[in-house]
């Protein structure tokens, strides 16, 4: 936090990959991180770095805080539903699966213990929940509640978010596609996924590794009035370095897609 403050005071443009300036309410750092922010006045100076949601603000910002990997993957699927007042905002459940690289580059559990797992971690109060709630609440103009439970799975990179929501009103599939297309048709890093059969019926992070894309799809559970919004990304690209470069390009007036418009590394 001190380094960012010092650079900001010198007038430098900053892309921050840490979580230190993602949340705008100082009290949220106590809730989600268990510490008091040393520079609360600077939180309001930071822009949350998702160009698909905040492109114009990022263009003018001096400090952009890149989002958490699971947070950005989930909120890109949920935001159009909140924006169009389609779902119950008190009952949103995010079930996330993430590869081992989501734990960072430091030494950790040995391969023998990590390989082959489907392991829940932080099933309640994961810190990325605060980012999702913050951004969706801003869209809704009211407080949004999100329950998030992440799981470590046996891949190196990739995120799949299964976002369980409950409809406030009846809507058919065609109208849902229209809403998503209206929101993202001009966004080159968002791909809407739905095949009637085969391996590509829904988003799959296997087909995103090495790219800055976020794939979004959905399914309807009419019996339970449930809309399942599905989103996938590469946590090291859209969830980290790719977003940082995309934000830098927007801040600097460069071509937004410079350096990151790569096809996924498939097959791996």
Whereabouts are the PLM-identified features?
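C-terminal substrate-binding/catalytic lobe of Rossmann-fold NAD(P)-dependent oxidoreductases
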Residues: 90-96, 100-229
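Alpha-helical scaffold segments in soluble metabolic enzymes
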Residues: 76, 80, 131-135, 179, ...
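C-terminal helical cap and adjacent loop that interface with cofactors, partners, or active-site loops
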Residues: 185, 205-268
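N-terminal Rossmann-like NAD(P) cofactor-binding subdomain of oxidoreductases
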Residues: 1-123, 141, 219-222, 257-258, ...
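Short glycine/serine/threonine-biased micro-segments
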Residues: 47, 66, 97-100, 156, ...
């Amino acid at each position: 936090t001190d380094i960012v403050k010092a650079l900001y005071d010198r007038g430098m443009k900053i892309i921050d990959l840490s979580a230190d300036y993602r949340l705008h309410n100082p009290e949220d750092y106590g809730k989600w991180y268990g510490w008091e922010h040393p520079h609360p006045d600077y939180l309001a100076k930071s822009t949350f770095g998702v160009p698909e949601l905040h492109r114009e603000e990022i263009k003018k910002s001096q400090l952009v805080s890149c989002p958490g990997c699971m947070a950005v993957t989930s909120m890109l699927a949920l935001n159009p539903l909140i924006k169009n007042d389609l779902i119950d905002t008190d009952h949103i459940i995010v079930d996330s699966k993430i590869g081992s690289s989501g734990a960072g580059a430091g030494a950790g559990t040995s391969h023998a213990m990590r390989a082959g797992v489907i392991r829940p971690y932080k099933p309640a109060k994961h810190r990325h929940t605060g980012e999702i709630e913050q951004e969706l609440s801003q869209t809704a103009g009211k407080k949004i509640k999100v329950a998030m439970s992440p799981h470590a799975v046996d891949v190196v990179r990739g995120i799949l978010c299964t976002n369980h929501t409950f409809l406030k009103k009846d809507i058919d599939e065609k109208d849902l596609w229209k809403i998503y297309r209206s929101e993202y048709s001009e966004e080159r890093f968002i791909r809407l996924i739905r095949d009637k059969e085969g391996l590509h019926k829904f988003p799959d992070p296997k087909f995103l590794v090495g790219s800055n894309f976020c794939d979004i799809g959905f399914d309807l559970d009419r019996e339970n009035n449930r809309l399942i919004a599905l989103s996938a990304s590469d946590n090291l690209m859209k969830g980290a370095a790719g977003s940082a470069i995309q934000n830098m390009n927007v801040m600097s007036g460069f071509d937004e897609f410079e350096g990151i418009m790569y096809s996924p590394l498939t097959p791996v």
